[in-house]
């Protein structure tokens, strides 16, 4: 009986009606996706490659091997995050399975990006002990966040967004030390970038504003905030290294 049921299910899955249903769903996704969806992160990924390469090269040549390695970790995390996001949002995935796995990867890479952004600050702008503590917190939190996104992809935004925010504001506990070792400019840029990331995360969570749903919606505001915040943190890296 089980074999007959499986055969019936397979036959049903191959019917024209079933195929038409999937076609309609696919067309609906394409038509409802804002035209700007993903493009901000496409350009951000390309910019990150060029800007990151210059930062790593100069850090290694003029700074130190530690500066080169830490900025390399930061650059790799930034490029990967923007690339995965751009790929997920620009491609019209025909396979629901592939789309769901890319969504998990997209959300997971935000945790890697946060930890990667902290790495130069932790190893170059903090005392050795404090730096190790920060690295343990942010990378441990990143691993936990990745496991959450991979194992519980349907987790509500009220769970994921607060985790991003909590992990992103670890630097608050080391404000005085960062100010002393990296300077006021680096600290201001760090906090301005953090504020923009937080604002973007909140806009994503509440799905607002959404003024032009077919062109530039709330998700694009979120991506715009992350792009500008990344610029702030990139500039801050130069002050941390030099």
Swiss-Prot record:
Transmembrane segments: 42-62, 67-87, 108-128, 133-153, 159-179, 186-206, 222-242
Keyword Secreted in record: no
GO CC annotations, alphabetized: plasma membrane
Listed InterPro entries: AdipoR/HlyIII-related, Hy-lIII
Main localisation: membrane
Example GO molecular function: pore-forming activity
Subcellular location, record wording: Cell membrane
UniProt entry keywords in alphabetical sequence: Cell membrane, Membrane, Transmembrane, Transmembrane helix
Alphabetical list of Pfam families matching this protein: HlyIII
Topological relation to the membrane, as annotated: Multi-pass membrane protein
UniProt family annotation: Belongs to the UPF0073 (Hly-III) family.
Protein name (Swiss-Prot/TrEMBL): UPF0073 membrane protein Mb1114c
Organism: Mycobacterium bovis (strain ATCC BAA-935 / AF2122/97)
